[in-house]
């Protein structure tokens, strides 16, 4: 793996002066295995960090300039503290800038800064690459400025900074997973309590393959907004007719009772969420009980619901999942992330990987997209690195 420290010193001519402190942090990407489409602020996720990560190095400057270098693409961006604002053309650098904004808002004596970034998290496939940059930058700057913020307070401050910098904030779960994940563990992440509970993996005999379908994802945001509206409307009706404050309190039978009131699309969307909440708990029990076959059934049923009820899959992704499930040695396969393309994950024995890879030749012939496979492991959370 690349180490960003020497690259940073070379980029900013710091190789001769070792007295100039360079702080380095890394943060992981993540995979949601179950639960990523849920009730806003009340979701329940089975997730993990992965060993695909970003590394970020930062050092102080003597002026008020802000310099950014992406080592993997050799891109450079620059701005100043006086001009610290979102710029669309700055793309990846905006995720570092929001962390700078965080510490400016906290009243830290921020001066000019040099940043270098390297990462191997696949982008635009719902693996939290941008959140990893934000967390790595926030952790590095916390250390550089010696600010006594615990991880939860850091996440709260980062969400507030996002609102000020971007005009909106992300859900906190991805940041909590990035900070609290443990090696070789899944995590149960609960949005209502902000608790992230590690669950030891029982899959030492398996590897995890992420397959990028390469399907273009135009128009995804409006489709997702429609589903969020359906969840809100379902909650409104369940609240008034069944006194349910949350989908966690609801049952599929409640939706059946309201069949004459609920439009069909709202019934389907909310049915998926209610059943998915149960599936996350079932998966937790399967992992605790060392029952991989029960986990496999849960994964299969989840994808079927995402396809048929929540309707965020697509033919290409369904093909990948179906073909994977046909292979002896595959425990489970499912779409992950926002949907309408993106990635699948496949939990597979090493002996079956060659057969899986061979079947992807048919995918390209049928759909015209060249899929990309990433082999990943359950990874640890964000941390500081020695230079």
Regions found by a protein language model. Name each.
Residues 1-31, 37-44, 89-203, 352-353, ...:
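Gly/Ser-rich oxyanion-binding loop with an adjacent helix/lid
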Residues 2-34, 55-94, 109, 185-332, ...:
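C-terminal nucleotide
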Residues 115-117, 211-213, 344:
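A structural signal for short, well-ordered beta-strand segments
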Residues 131-132, 343-347:
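FabD-like malonyl-/acyl-CoA
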Residues 126, 143-146, 216, 345, ...:
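Amphipathic alpha-helical interaction elements
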Residues 340:
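Glycine-rich phosphate-binding loop
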Residues 42-49, 227-228:
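Short Gly/aromatic-enriched secondary-structure transition segments
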């Amino acid at each position: 793996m690349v180490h960003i420290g020497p690259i940073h010193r070379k980029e900013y001519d710091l190789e001769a002066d070792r007295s100039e402190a360079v702080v380095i942090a890394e943060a992981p990407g993540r995979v949601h295995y179950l639960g990523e489409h849920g009730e806003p602020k009340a979701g329940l996720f089975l997730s993990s960090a992965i060993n695909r990560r970003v590394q970020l190095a930062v050092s102080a400057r003597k002026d008020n300039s802000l310099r950014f270098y992406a080592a993997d693409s050799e891109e450079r961006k620059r701005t100043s503290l006086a001009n610290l604002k979102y710029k669309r053309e700055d793309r990846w650098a905006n995720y570092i800038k929001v962390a700078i904004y965080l510490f400016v808002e906290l009243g830290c004596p921020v001066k000019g800064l040099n940043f270098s970034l390297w990462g191997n998290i696949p982008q635009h496939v719902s693996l939290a690459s941008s959140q990893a940059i934000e967390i790595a930058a926030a952790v590095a700057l916390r250390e550089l400025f010696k600010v006594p913020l615990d991880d939860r307070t850091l996440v709260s401050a980062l969400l507030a900074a996002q609102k000020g910098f971007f005009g909106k904030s992300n859900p906190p779960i991805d940041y909590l997973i990035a900070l609290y994940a443990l090696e070789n563990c899944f995590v149960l992440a609960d949005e209502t309590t902000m608790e992230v509970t590690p669950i030891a993996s029982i899959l030492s005999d398996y590897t995890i393959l992420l397959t990028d379908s390469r399907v273009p994802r135009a128009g995804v945001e409006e489709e997702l907004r429609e589903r969020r509206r359906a969840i809100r409307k379902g909650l409104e009706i369940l609240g008034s007719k069944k006194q349910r404050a949350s989908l966690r309190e609801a049952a599929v039978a409640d939706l059946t009772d309201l069949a004459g009131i609920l439009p069909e699309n709202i019934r389907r969307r909310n049915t998926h969420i209610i059943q998915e909440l149960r599936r996350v708990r079932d998966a937790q029990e399967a992992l605790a009980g060392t029952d991989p076959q029960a986990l496999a059934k849960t994964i299969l049923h989840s994808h079927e619901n995402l396809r048929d009820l929540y309707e965020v899959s697509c033919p290409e992704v369904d093909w990948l999942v179906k073909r994977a499930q046909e292979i002896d040695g595959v425990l489970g396969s499912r779409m992950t992330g926002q949907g309408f393309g993106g990635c699948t994950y496949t939990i597979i024995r090493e002996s079956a990987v060659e057969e899986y890879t061979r079947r992807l030749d048919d995918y390209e012939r049928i759909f015209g997209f060249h899929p990309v496979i990433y082999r990943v492991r359950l990874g640890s959370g964000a941390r500081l690195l020695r230079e």
